[in-house]
Structures are given as structure tokens and as C-alpha cells.
């Protein structure tokens, strides 16, 4: 931030016309014996308490030295070429004004942000009447760290006991210890080598897109199919909660000039994607904007609550270039974002028990479990500690709780569910939050049983996590299996190709196609390797592709009406196609299905370089 101090005998301003879509109320004004602070907010400035208090104290110190009876904060975009975005600049100027008011004993004024203004001044002309300053956010890091240290971390057991994380006995709870090391003591463990899952990503066509921005992926046909299957499954899981769920679709760009959007965006901080057009637009970082913008126009009765709304939202977060991780930490990803609208906090807490059960059930289907971090506000912790104990009891193991002082959050509870990955690192996958602020921010209302207008409490959740992170958990599970000497095998419902038919010779191709037709008619994804390659190479290629059922057919199989099956991780056997179909249908029961996203015949597919 750059500021210019002018000690004036008199100063006045008059609002002329809007300069920005994001602006304050158009108020003209003036002051006598005023220290006028021409204020330019620069890129990289943050609305951080320590940073703003540092600036405010300097302003007040100068005002007291020159014996000014008032201070005027005057937004001024002409002291730097590195300007902050308007929404960020306005927030910082407004917060600076509030901090200066709390520090100064005289009158404090603020000229409105976002307008062309005329001003008149008479500078007093003494040695301290004209001063300039430059402030950097880094100077306030010590205060920020001190603020972080005020957060209280507690380990809560299923029996309700509380423990200091530094003194807790972690025997039998090694995963919790890893999470505590990272979250409480800020020690990142594990790593040190390339994770095995990256090799799997290349196999199925999950790749960075080098012609786009950092952190953007592309998805080959196999990867696209897997992504869309997970999207379908996320909707099915949401419907399994036993509440009505509405699935929607919307835009990914929203105007920062909308007060609710701008206010919500400020909560997210610096990781925003901004698009410059006729007006500043933000790329959404979750489905919140679209769902809330839609629901605010609905007429809702208490009888219709709770209900959910789901969108698989393409989401954008401006992660640091060195922090992006394929399939895990991305600048653009897909979030099956479910919001559940409830009457009040009590109902929201009751619904979260169902969510909690679903979250652990789904990760359990992958053969994994979570270790949990519960971020709670201090007031919520004091009022609802027993609720957290109940969640620990349901998990059957201790949980880590972080108690945050103050009321600066729109949520009262934000739960992170972590797996410990192949390299021993905590990796957040699923989440839920209880939100008590956004209904009022966006104007979402319902009518209660007494015909009174109320604001619902909103649960945010991704039961599976983002689509990419769910697949990350799948592939990390396979990496752990391979580390233990087992052949990695995708769940059959997620396998891009579920059955591959390999004719021994060209003479057997007709029978291979007939068998493939039977599988396809039953909704099973099947292809045929009709390439002019040796049988051993074609079998090997199918194994490398992790096809769960490789069916070799020759003259003998054709005569007997069977296929010779090589089941991944399950041995070899001969079976009629109809019996294998029954086995596969049982294997994929309860999961979504989509057709093959590639030509059936391998000879028609180009190879990737």
C-alpha cells in the first residue's frame, strides 16, 4: 500500500460520477484541520488485521504529531502502477478506515470508493505537512503467526476425554499422529519420492494441459469416462441421504459488483480467478454462488426442509504454481457440491449425522478410512461439545478439534476428512460445513410454521470430495496395494474397459464380435483386440491396461460356446459368456453405468505418444 499524507487547513470532496461497478454510497463531505490520507491499495495487499493495524498506527502517529483534529481516508488510485483488484481494494480501504477509527480519538472520515470525485484542499505547508509511505504485508507476519497460535487444538476421544495433542498417546492411532504433526505442529511428514499414482494417471489419460494455465488438466477418453462415472455416483450418493435433492446446472462466472458475490469472495481471499470484461467477473471456486443465486428466488416453506441441491461445478482456485499436484491440487477441478438447506442449527446437526455416516461408508468401500479434523468456532464448541463427542464415538477413534476464537467465519463447523496417502501425508478428500451466514448474505429465506420469515442454516458438503480427489483416493489405494505386492485393480464399475475379447486368430474374430455383442447388450463395457499382434502381446497390453476380465477366444472356445477368462487378481477359468455377465453385473450392483467412450476395435484407436 502506498499513502500520501497531507496536513490540511481544510479539505472537501464532491462525488461526480461512478468510476467502477464496485463502489460505496456516493457521499460528499469535508473536514477542517485534517490529515488527509490519499490511499492506493496495491496488488499483494491483504485485509489482514496486523497489516492494517500497522498502517493505522502510523497514520494516527502522524496525525498526533501534526496535531490534526480529524483524519480523512481518501481512496486514490494514482500512487502506484500495481493496483489491487477493485473488490480487494475496497475491502482493504474500508477495513483500514475501521481500524483507524478504533485507534484515533478524533473524527475519522472516509471518501467513497469507486467514484470520480472533485476535491479542494489548503495544505498547511509546515515541514511535516507532506509525507509519503509504502507498506508491505510481510511486515505483519509475526502478528499473524501470533494469531494462529491462539487457536486451540484438542484431541477428543469417543468417551469424551480431552487431551493435549502434544501429550496424547498415539499408540494404535498412527494416522491421527500424522495429521497432528501437520496441522498442530506444522511438520510435513512423508514424501521424498514420486508417488506411484502418477504412473497410473498417465495410463488412463489424466494429464496436465501445457497449452493452458498452470494447474489445468485434460482428460483422455478413459479419464473422461471415469470422471463422469464419479459424477453420476456423487448424485446417487446424495439421493441416498433420504432427503429431496434437486440437481441443477449454471454458469461459472459471477459479477463482483453484486454485493453478495463480492462479500462471499472476500472470505475466500487471494486465490480468486478474475476475468476482466466490461465488468470484473469472478470464476466460481465452488457451486455456492450459483446455487444460492437460484434458491434465493424460490418460495420455500418449512414443510419442504430439509432439501438438497447438487451441481457438479467446474471450480477455479488460483493455487500457487509450485503447489499444484496432478489430480489433487488444481486450478480447475470438478466439485460435486451438495448444499442442504435446513430449518435451524439443530436440524443441520441432525442431518450431518447422516452425512458423516455416508462419508465414512463411501471411503470404506475403497478399503480406506478417514482421520478427521474438526474446525469449530469457540462459541459452537462451548455450546455443542457433546455433538463432537458423538461424532468421535461414531468414528470409533479419537478426533482432532481446532477451536478458533472470534466470529470471523460464515461457518460454525468445518470438517476435513483426510486419508493418509502412500507416502504418509494427510490428504483431505471429503468435507462438510455448517454455514450460518450465507442465507442472509444472499437473501435465502423460508416461512416457518408461525408464518414468520427465517433464514435457513446451510450445510456444504462434498461426500466423495471433488471428482479428481475421489479418483486420487482410488489410485492411492491401488498404489498401497501394489506396494504390498498385490496387482492393482480398479473397481469394476470404474474400469474404462470391463471386458476385453482377444481372438487367437483372425478366424476367431467373428465369434469374438458375437461374444462382445452379448456383453454390450447387458450394459458392460467391452472391446475387441483385433490388431495384427501376437497373442502374448495383446494379453500383455490388456494386463497393462488393468482390464479386469480378459477373454481369450479360439476355435475350441467357439466350439464349446465359452470364453477363457484371465481375471485380474482372480486367476484363470473357462466360463459361458452368460455366467460371466451375471458375475460382472453382481460386481457393479449399486453403481452407475456408462457406455464405452472409444471405438470397440483397438485397430481403430490411435496410440498416444
From Swiss-Prot:
Q: Which Pfam families match?
A: HGTP_anticodon, tRNA-synt_2b, tRNA-Thr_ED
Main localization of the protein described in the UniProt heading = cytoplasm
Q: Where is this region: Editing domain?
A: 1-143
CDD domains in the cross-refs: ThrRS_anticodon
InterPro entries reported for this sequence: aa-tRNA-synt_IIb, aa-tRNA-synth_II, aa-tRNA-synth_II/BPL/LPL, Anticodon-bd, Anticodon-bd_dom_sf, DTD-like_sf, Thr-tRNA-ligase_IIa, Threonyl-tRNA_syn_edit_dom_arc
Q: Which GO terms describe its cellular component?
A: cytoplasm
Q: Which domain of life is it from?
A: Archaea
Q: Does the keyword NAD apply?
A: no
Residue ranges annotated as coiled coil are none
Q: Which Gene3D superfamilies match?
A: Anticodon-binding domain, Bira Bifunctional Protein, Domain 2, D-tyrosyl-tRNA(Tyr) deacylase
Q: Which cofactor does it need?
A: Zn(2+)
Please describe what this protein does: Catalyzes the attachment of threonine to tRNA(Thr) in a two-step reaction: L-threonine is first activated by ATP to form Thr-AMP and then transferred to the acceptor end of tRNA(Thr). Also edits incorrectly charged L-seryl-tRNA(Thr).
What protein family is recorded?
Belongs to the class-II aminoacyl-tRNA synthetase family.
The family database entries (HAMAP family) matched by this protein are listed as: Thr_tRNA_synth
What's the protein name? Answer: Threonine--tRNA ligase
